[in-house]
Amino acid sequence: MRLLAQHSAGFDPGEPWLEGDVSTRRDSHLFTQMVARRTSPHTGREHSFYRLQGPDWVNVIAFTKELELLVVEQYRHGINEATLEIPGGCCDPGETPLDSAKRELVEESGFATDTWISLGSCTPNPATQTNRAHTFLALECEAKAGLCLDAA
């Protein structure tokens, strides 16, 4: 396999844009919408760019000792239906991604483990969001507690 990178119009896409004023447009429970004025290093023109600042989140791919994959069914208001998904959620302030993953696994499934492997992180929507998604593999999970879902 070979990586083929294409640059638009001969410009260096890694060349930083000069950032001007940044202001908050709207602050909500989960995200803060920001607008940043930036100047193109190629044309010198100024543009507005919108971004959502929010907490990092975690995804947990969890298996029991019997190699059963743990999934949770949750109602999701964004799509107005129930989904079947792996445990996960937002990192709380001051919490490491691993601590968030451990907490979310117990909260959403009642299972816990001491065997954790980080599978890395990514920027799930770098065009408009500033946060990262961290994915963990949890092995040999055992039932430890009842569900402790976030209050809603």
Task: Identify the role of each PLM range.
Residues 22-24, 120-125:
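Short, solvent-exposed loop/turn elements at beta->coil junctions and helix N-caps
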Residues 68-69, 116, 133-135:
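Conserved active-site beta-strand-loop modules that form the wall/rim of enzyme catalytic pockets
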